[in-house]
């Protein structure tokens, strides 16, 4: 059974500590994945202001966020400028590419993207993407060929903004199948590879206990589904690193074969159906996010 493995790297600590452990676990399992890196300032601690929203507060409490992520992640960029991830830790991004993994852009400023996507102008959206692309291009020494919107914060405006960067594909939304998003002028944009499986933080607590998560998620892979799974360097690369190593071993026993997302594209892109990315909601995730629409 084929499956896509996507690894989101949101923070400075996730890059510095989580990525090396994930690379080690993946090498041990003989698995290649797609890493989406945040490359600008780590301002993730500014999400603490969202605690005034009941849904976000409940998510932080049920997932034991302080224990899961660590206070350095939860406070990053609050009382001091966020550390520059790409400038300080670009060598780990190059190491990821050299290890044979696919590398794409997650965001310039992960917090900024999640907090402001819905109100930024088209010019501001394009500038944020450009800063991230230029930075990651310089770090890798080659052009970035794919991207994934931070927090799945994407809609039709975001899809339009990304089109000018010539990405081979994007993974900006939640959905059930690969598709070509329809643009404002009626043409079709770069392929979308949605995520169709829940993440650890979306279900642990209200749905399943952390100790039972591996079995829970592996039971949801199916030959007749897309099977795109997302892990986070801040979770599966740090506190849950051993559990992720066990998940990779269990997946192999179940004949689940992970691969980079780019490998899931068909040879003939014209064979993909048309669709669109629209705003929607998802149980376990606070606020709006991009979902696959008809």
UniProtKB/Swiss-Prot annotation:
For molecular function, the Gene Ontology terms on record are: hydrolase activity, acting on carbon-nitrogen (but not peptide) bonds, in linear amides
Which pathway is this protein engaged in?
Glycolipid biosynthesis; 4-amino-4-deoxy-alpha-L-arabinose undecaprenyl phosphate biosynthesis; 4-amino-4-deoxy-alpha-L-arabinose undecaprenyl phosphate from UDP-4-deoxy-4-formamido-beta-L-arabinose and undecaprenyl phosphate: step 2/2; Bacterial outer membrane biogenesis; lipopolysaccharide biosynthesis
Report any one BP term from Gene Ontology.
Answer: lipopolysaccharide biosynthetic process
Can you say what this protein is called?
A: Probable 4-deoxy-4-formamido-L-arabinose-phosphoundecaprenol deformylase ArnD
Gene Ontology CC entries for this record: membrane
Query: Which family is it part of?
Result: Belongs to the polysaccharide deacetylase family. ArnD deformylase subfamily.
Its annotated function is as follows:
Catalyzes the deformylation of 4-deoxy-4-formamido-L-arabinose-phosphoundecaprenol to 4-amino-4-deoxy-L-arabinose-phosphoundecaprenol. The modified arabinose is attached to lipid A and is required for resistance to polymyxin and cationic antimicrobial peptides.
Principal EC category: hydrolase
- From what superkingdom does this record's organism come? Bacteria
Does Cell membrane appear among the keywords? Answer: no
Q: What HAMAP family does the database record attribute to this sequence? A: ArnD
Where in the numbering of this chain does the NodB homology domain appear? 1-259
Keyword Hydrolase annotated: yes
Q: Which reaction does it catalyse?
A: 4-deoxy-4-formamido-alpha-L-arabinopyranosyl di-trans,octa-cis-undecaprenyl phosphate + H2O = 4-amino-4-deoxy-alpha-L-arabinopyranosyl di-trans,octa-cis-undecaprenyl phosphate + formate
- Identify the keywords attached in UniProt to this record, alphabetized: Antibiotic resistance, Hydrolase, Lipid A biosynthesis, Lipid biosynthesis, Lipid metabolism, Lipopolysaccharide biosynthesis
Concerning InterPro entries, the annotation shows:
ArnD, Glyco_hydro/deAcase_b/a-brl, NODB_dom, Polysacc_deacetylase_ArnD
């Amino acid at each position: 059974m084929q499956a896509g493995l996507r690894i989101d790297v949101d923070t400075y600590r996730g890059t510095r500590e989580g990525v090396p452990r994930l690379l080690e676990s993946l090498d041990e399992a003989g698995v290649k994945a797609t890493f989406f890196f945040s490359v600008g300032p780590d301002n993730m601690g500014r999400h603490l202001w969202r605690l005034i929203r009941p849904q976000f507060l409940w998510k932080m409490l049920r997932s034991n966020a302080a224990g899961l992520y660590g206070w350095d992640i939860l406070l990053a960029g609050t009382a001091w400028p966020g550390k520059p991830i790409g400038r300080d830790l670009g060598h780990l991004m190059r190491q990821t590419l050299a290890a044979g993994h696919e590398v794409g852009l997650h965001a310039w400023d992960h917090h900024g993207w999640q907090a402001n996507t819905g109100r930024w102008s088209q010019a501001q959206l394009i500038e944020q993407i450009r800063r991230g692309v230029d930075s990651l291009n310089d770090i890798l020494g080659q052009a970035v060929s794919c991207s994934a919107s931070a927090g799945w914060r994407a809609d039709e405006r975001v899809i339009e903004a990304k089109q000018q960067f010539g990405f081979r594909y994007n993974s900006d939304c939640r959905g059930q199948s690969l598709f070509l998003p329809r643009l404002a002028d009626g043409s079709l944009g770069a392929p979308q590879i949605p995520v169709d499986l829940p993440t650890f933080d979306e279900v642990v607590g209200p749905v399943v206990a952390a100790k039972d998560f591996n079995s829970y998620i592996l039971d949801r892979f199916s030959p007749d589904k897309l099977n795109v799974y997302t892990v986070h360097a801040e979770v599966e690369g740090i506190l849950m690193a051993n559990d992720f190593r066990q998940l990779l071993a269990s997946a192999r026993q179940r004949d689940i074969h992970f691969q980079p997302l780019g490998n899931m594209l068909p040879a003939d892109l014209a064979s993909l159906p048309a669709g669109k990315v629209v705003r929607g909601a998802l149980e376990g995730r606070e606020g709006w996010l991009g979902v696959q629409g008809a």
